[in-house]
Amino acid sequence: MGINPTRDGILRVCRQMGANIQILNQREHCQEPAADLLVKYSSLKGTVIQGELIPTLIDELPVIAVMAAFAEGVTVIRDAQELKVKESNRLDIMVHHLQAMGADVTPTEDGMIIKGGPLLHGAQLDSHLDHRIAMSFAVAGLASEGETEITQADCVNISYPKFYEDLQSLQH
């Protein structure tokens, strides 16, 4: 995994939330810092994500929002208005999709407030042809009760053609 400090915000947020992640085998790859990660099960807790941390994880906020829905406590995401002008309006879509799956999510002008809680349930969702939305909610669907269907889910091929194959391998 790339661990460049300008792009490692997801790793920092995971640790803030209580994730048990060890960084191993640090090295240079294509002139960038990289490492292997050892991730072990841990209960996650809510946190505040804002300010200078946002640019280091702007593309990972959809999956962080999914994590927050399963975490204990409240997660507040602020200063993320840039998500409104990505491949889709990711802020609105994330709120809508999490709510459709039963999460307690309140939109704000520049982010959202997510109250983690009971297990989510399956839902019919639209990728909006946004690969990060499709991948994030595929993960949410796996961790939820019932079936989740994502339309145009093959949009993940733009960035991660083997995503579904790799995700399925984690189920076993």
Question: Model-found features: residue ranges?
Answer:
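Short, structured segments at the rim of ligand-binding sites
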Residues: M1-H172
